[in-house]
From Swiss-Prot:
The gene is mutM. Binds 1 zinc ion per subunit. GO terms for biological process: base-excision repair. It catalyses: Hydrolysis of DNA containing ring-opened 7-methylguanine residues, releasing 2,6-diamino-4-hydroxy-5-(N-methyl)formamidopyrimidine; 2'-deoxyribonucleotide-(2'-deoxyribose 5'-phosphate)-2'-deoxyribonucleotide-DNA = a 3'-end 2'-deoxyribonucleotide-(2,3-dehydro-2,3-deoxyribose 5'-phosphate)-DNA + a 5'-end 5'-phospho-2'-deoxyribonucleoside-DNA + H(+). CDD domains: EcFpg-like_N. Involved in base excision repair of DNA damaged by oxidation or by mutagenic agents. Acts as a DNA glycosylase that recognizes and removes damaged bases. Has a preference for oxidized purines, such as 7,8-dihydro-8-oxoguanine (8-oxoG). Has AP (apurinic/apyrimidinic) lyase activity and introduces nicks in the DNA strand. Cleaves the DNA backbone by beta-delta elimination to generate a single-strand break at the site of the removed base with both 3'- and 5'-phosphates. GO terms for molecular function: 8-oxo-7,8-dihydroguanine DNA N-glycosylase activity; class I DNA-(apurinic or apyrimidinic site) endonuclease activity; damaged DNA binding; zinc ion binding. It comes from Xanthomonas campestris pv. campestris (strain B100). PROSITE patterns: FPG_CAT, ZF_FPG_1, ZF_FPG_2. A zinc finger (FPG-type) spans 237-271. Its cofactor is Zn(2+). This is Formamidopyrimidine-DNA glycosylase.
Length: 271
């Protein structure tokens, strides 16, 4: 599933092509995604002008002058591309939003786990209203994590992946951040010290910022809007490397399932 760096990469690739463009039309080839595509998308987008493209957590928000925004989630395997308007659709190209410059914003989603919704006020939408802070914002600190974790018995990796705690940190970047901070993913969240949470918050920020710089992580499905892969995969220290040697100490990396998610860590480097 695309995580925050992949969605941010998508945003940065799309925004220059979309902001200020008037929408000419919308084609829905298959509206029955995990969340059915909102009927307002067909009704209100044609004739509207795109005023901004933003990200909240793993959601892309396409603001318009039609009194609302399109709320888009890439799901497990979705992608967005800006293409010439006469580009033939491929399999799983479910939505086309045609623009005044003759190009088209195309949403492809093979597994149909994504969504394309309409919302007057994005911050009040049920999918967004209860989300935690952005990990790259000043609100996300080690002190914040330490205070919120008090008394929690869940594994710290599960805690870090809770979108009500902090948004956008999924399995890949939680594993990598915990490795950099030297914290075992198995440790109870409430038993991590303030100082170690400060290291963890710094690690999350550093790893996410670098992953964005590298264009995200291409594992199976993610490609950026220009079709390029993400290159952070080459930098992975633990994720997907079970049974291999730790790049820091040479010990064999361990593997377990935590919260129904595969987890890899170094028992020597992470305590």
């Amino acid at each position: 599933m695309p995580e925050l760096p992949e969605v941010e990469t998508t945003l940065r690739g799309l925004a220059p092509h979309l902001v200020g463009q008037r929408i000419h039309g919308v084609i829905l080839r298959r509206p029955d995604l995990r969340w059915p595509i909102a009927e307002q998308i067909e009704q209100l987008l044609p004739g509207a002008t795109i005023t901004d493209v933003r990200r909240r957590a793993k959601y892309l928000l396409i603001d318009t002058d039609a009194g609302g925004s399109a709320v888009l989630h890439l799901g497990m395997s979705g992608s967005l591309r800006v293409l010439p308007g006469d580009t033939p659709p491929r399999a799983h190209d479910h939505v086309d939003i045609s623009l005044q410059n003759g190009r088209v914003l195309r949403f492809n989603d093979p597994r149909r786990f994504g969504c394309l919704l309409w919302q007057r006020d994005c911050e009040t939408h049920e999918l967004l209203a209860s989300l935690g802070p952005e990990p790259l914002s000043p609100a996300f600190t080690g002190d914040y994590l330490h205070a919120l974790a008090r008394g929690r018995r869940a594994a710290v990796k599960t805690f870090l992946m809770d979108q009500a705690v902090v948004v956008g940190v999924g399995n890949i970047y939680a594993a990598e951040s915990l490795h950099r901070a030297g914290i075992s993913p198995l440790r109870e969240a409430g038993k991590v010290s303030r100082e170690r949470y400060r290291r963890l918050a710094d690690a999350v920020k550093e790893i996410l910022a670098y992953a964005i710089q590298r264009g995200g992580t291409t594992l199976r499905d993610f490609i950026s809007p220009d079709g390029a892969p993400g290159y952070f995969e080459q930098e992975l220290m633990v994720y997907g490397r079970e049974g291999q040697a730790c790049k820091h100490c040479g010990r064999e990396l361990k593997h377990a399932t935590i919260g129904q998610r595969a987890t890899v860590w170094c028992a020597a480097c992470q305590r």
